[in-house]
Curated annotation (Swiss-Prot):
This is Cytosolic Fe-S cluster assembly factor NUBP2 homolog. It comes from Nematostella vectensis (Starlet sea anemone). Component of the cytosolic iron-sulfur (Fe/S) protein assembly (CIA) machinery. Required for maturation of extramitochondrial Fe-S proteins. The NUBP1-NUBP2 heterotetramer forms a Fe-S scaffold complex, mediating the de novo assembly of an Fe-S cluster and its transfer to target apoproteins. Binds 4 [4Fe-4S] clusters per heterotetramer. Contains two stable clusters in the N-termini of NUBP1 and two labile, bridging clusters between subunits of the NUBP1-NUBP2 heterotetramer. InterPro entries: Mrp-like_CS (IPR000808), Mrp/NBP35_ATP-bd (IPR019591), NUBP2/Cfd1_eukaryotes (IPR028600), P-loop_NTPase (IPR027417), YlxH/NBP35 (IPR033756). GO terms for cellular component: cytosol. Heterotetramer of 2 NUBP1 and 2 NUBP2 chains. [4Fe-4S] cluster binds at C195, C198.
Length: 270
């Protein structure tokens, strides 16, 4: 049987999904900062936002006032800089206004996602990070079904230390098992608070729930990312935090997580 890989993904080396069981856990923040960190390591990176009803990636990457252009092979992603090593695609670029709401039924959403996966000309890139909506819905099933022939490297599951968020991650793990998507690991976001004055990290919430869940479910634990007010400010400005806050515990955590992801994906390649 002939295996057909979507045209836009034929030169993509590694595909990683970013999932969360519920909203508000910082999934898009993790997706953007992982993309920046991979970029800063010298990789060519694509960031695809398929959260159709809440497209926050364009603003977080400081590219929201750009337009998507067409080429002979499809859509050209919006690049963050002239080196064209970090490209972004989101429905946010296709809306007339930032205030426009996407009020679509499932079939239209699914068709849009299929078009994103097949018609975006990513070119020869090392990583494609796919930021998904929270939960498990039609959008997730559409993504997984259309990526089957690409054999994605796996999914990163984002949670916070609270019990409610952690219990929702269990459903994400079950979803990955049912759809045969490997789990690259769990990231515990908002784990501790970094003082903006002394950079000391204090556990204002509970801590360690993500790591305990990873052990229980026998999936890798990638690390904890603390709350850092400076990181929040940089995200609001659409900046790569790792260039500006090299001594931040949050930067150290993200870089450590990226190292683990790079190691896992390189093993998949071999």
């Amino acid at each position: 049987m002939c295996v057909v890989v979507p045209q836009g993904l034929r030169s993509v080396k590694h595909i990683i999904l970013v999932l969360s069981g519920k909203g508000g856990v910082g999934k898009s923040t993790v997706a953007t900062q992982l993309s920046w960190a991979l970029y800063n390591q010298g990789n060519k990176v694509g960031l695809l936002d398929i959260d159709l009803c809440g497209p926050s990636i364009p603003r977080m990457m400081n590219v929201e006032n750009n337009d998507v252009h067409q080429c002979s092979d499809g859509w050209v992603p919006v690049y963050t800089g002239p080196d064209q090593r970090l490209g972004v695609m989101s429905i946010g670029f296709l809306l007339h206004s930032k205030e426009d709401a996407v009020v679509w039924r499932g079939p239209k959403k699914n068709a849009m996602i299929k078009q994103f996966l097949s018609d975006v000309c990513w070119g020869d890139i090392d990583y494609l990070i796919i930021d998904t909506p929270p939960g498990t819905s039609d959008e997730h099933i559409t993504v997984v079904e259309n990526l089957k022939t690409c054999h994605p490297d796996g999914a990163i599951l984002v949670t916070t230390p609270q019990g409610v968020a952690i219990s929702d991650v269990r459903r994400e793990i079950t979803f990955c098992k049912k759809t045969k998507i490997p789990v690259l690991g769990i990231v515990e976001n908002m784990s501790g608070f970094v003082c903006p004055h002394c950079s000391e990290c204090t556990n204002v919430f509970s801590k360690g729930g993500g790591e305990a869940l990873a052990k229980e479910c026998e999936v890798p634990f990638l690390g904890c990312i603390p709350l850092d007010p400076n990181l929040t400010m940089n995200i609001e400005d659409g900046k790569s935090f790792s260039d500006l806050l090299s001594n931040s515990p949050a930067v150290e955590s993200v870089n450590s997580i990226v190292t683990k992801i790079s190691h896992a994906t390189s093993q998949n390649q071999t």
